[in-house]
């Protein structure tokens, strides 16, 4: 059967970590080969437009701006992306996210001027877009930046109230549906299990997002079937909402890399090239663009890297590392401050043999696709649950352990870094991640990959039936 013309609307949340995988999804949709043409319209705000234009250069995607509201309490003027917030705490994240609802009227007005929409994919944080889809009569799918494992574990913890009566932050409790997995209170957002939390603005926002998700036509995950088969199978059997695993989306840009010739090689790439030419292995260190790390913890990380004696490239915000650190490590380390780097290119560099990561899902999938083993240092949100997946289930990562006061000490960091880069454990993790990296590449192969087939099924379902 010949497919009708397909028009997909994408609306990513206003954060680079959320935009990037959805823009990769846009490229995947536009590269899809079947009888009907696909058009993609991406919604954003004026100040985010340049980043999206650059990310989708060379494609036929249409980009539509919707104004972000002015004078939002607590949000500095001119901020339209969470990366620009002074700090990503609930006191700023919640009003920023709530403010996006003020865009709804303009969003719907723009939608009505577009060609018929086959379906919309919008971020789970943009809960109000479900109402827009219902009013205008097209299906909405929710895009989640989490993996399936974290989603079903979270669901089990809340449905079973597993941690409501647990007093200790570190007491392990088995997840009923997955008894081999143990979670702790400290793996979740602080005070999430306090009865008083139900009146908290952040908790209410989560409830709105979950309610909206349950009214949608399904969820798209940036994962692939062979990466977490137990959890994907469980979700499909137990949940009413449909699931489509269409990742790893970071692979979508790979075909462009050979075509784009860099005019000016960045300093960090030159440094990596020098290390490669000298036969030196490098640890890549990055904790995401929005991580909040105490000065004490930063100091311990720095001293741990210094003590480890390994070569490292550290992408860091600000200038809060202890005095004299860079002079002491010399050519063994390179600091990249307040600069946007191409993380995928770093991880794919021949010299990079390990990744000290905060366990954001984008970072973990990029590391797996690049076949680089991970030292897990989860900081917030669902990152501790992501760490459980890569450490205990996939065995592509080792995890640092915090001392009793909650700080990971320099000795622990130095020991785990050396083991990852030079030890037997590191070799085992490298073998495992190489196997998953090959599976990841196969998942997106045209015509035979599981994620390609899942995308085919998604398009067929919503474009032939129109429901």
UniProtKB/Swiss-Prot annotation:
It is an enzyme of class 2 (transferase). Pfam families: UDPGT. It comes from the Eukaryota. Coiled coil: none annotated. Transmembrane segments: none annotated. Keywords: Glycosyltransferase, Transferase. GO terms for molecular function: glucosyltransferase activity; UDP-glycosyltransferase activity. UDP-alpha-D-glucose binds at residues 289, 341-343, 358-366, 380-383. The keyword rRNA processing does not apply. The keyword 4Fe-4S does not apply. Its EC number is 2.4.1.-. Belongs to the UDP-glycosyltransferase family. This is UDP-glycosyltransferase 90A2. It comes from Arabidopsis thaliana.
């Amino acid at each position: 059967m010949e497919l009708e013309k397909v028009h997909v609307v994408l609306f990513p949340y206003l954060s680079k970590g959320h935009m990037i995988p959805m823009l990769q999804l846009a490229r995947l949709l536009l590269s899809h080969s079947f009888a009907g043409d696909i058009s993609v319209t991406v919604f954003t705000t004026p100040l985010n437009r340049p980043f999206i234009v650059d990310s989708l250069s060379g494609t036929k995607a249409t980009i539509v701006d919707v104004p972000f509201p002015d004078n939002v309490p607590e949000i500095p003027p001119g901020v339209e992306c969470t990366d620009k917030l002074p700090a990503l705490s609930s006191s700023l994240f919640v009003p920023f996210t709530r403010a996006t609802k003020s865009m709804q009227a303009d969003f719907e007005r723009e939608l009505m001027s577009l060609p018929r929409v086959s379906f919309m994919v919008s971020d789970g944080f943009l809960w109000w877009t479900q109402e827009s889809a219902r009013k205008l009569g097209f299906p909405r799918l929710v895009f989640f930046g989490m993996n399936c494992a974290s989603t079903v574990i979270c669901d089990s913890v809340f449905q079973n109230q597993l941690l409501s009566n647990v007093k200790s932050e570190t007491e392990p409790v088995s997840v009923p549906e997955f008894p081999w997995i143990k979670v702790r209170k400290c793996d979740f957002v602080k005070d999430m299990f306090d009865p008083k939390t139900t009146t908290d603005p952040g908790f209410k926002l989560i409830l709105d997002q979950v309610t909206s998700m349950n009214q949608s036509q399904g969820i798209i995950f940036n994962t692939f079937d062979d990466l977490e088969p137990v959890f994907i199978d469980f979700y499909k059997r137990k949940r009413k909402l449909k699931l489509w695993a269409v990742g790893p989306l970071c692979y979508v840009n790979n075909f462009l890399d050979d075509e784009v010739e860099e005019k000016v090689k960045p300093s960090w790439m030159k440094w990596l090239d020098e290390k490669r030419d000298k036969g030196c292995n490098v640890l890549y260190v990055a904790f995401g663009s929005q991580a909040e790390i105490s000065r004490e913890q930063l100091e311990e990380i720095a001293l741990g890297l210094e003590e480890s004696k390994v070569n490292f490239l550290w992408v860091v915000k600000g200038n809060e590392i202890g005095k004299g650190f860079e002079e002491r490590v010399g050519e063994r380390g390179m600091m990249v401050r307040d600069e946007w780097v191409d993380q995928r290119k770093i991880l794919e560099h021949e010299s990079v043999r390990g990744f000290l990561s905060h366990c954001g899902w984008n970072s973990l999938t990029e590391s797996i696709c690049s076949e680089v083993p991970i030292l897990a240092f989860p900081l917030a949100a669902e990152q501790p649950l992501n760490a459980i997946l890569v450490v205990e289930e996939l065995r592509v990562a080792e995890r640092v352990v915090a001392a009793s006061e909650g700080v990971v000490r320099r000795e622990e960091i130095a020991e785990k870094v050396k083991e990852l880069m030079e030890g037997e454990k590191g070799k085992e993790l490298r073998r495992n991640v190489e196997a998953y990296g090959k599976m990841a590449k196969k998942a997106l192969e045209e015509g035979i990959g599981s994620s390609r087939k899942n995308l085919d099924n998604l398009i067929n379902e919503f474009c032939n039936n129109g429901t």
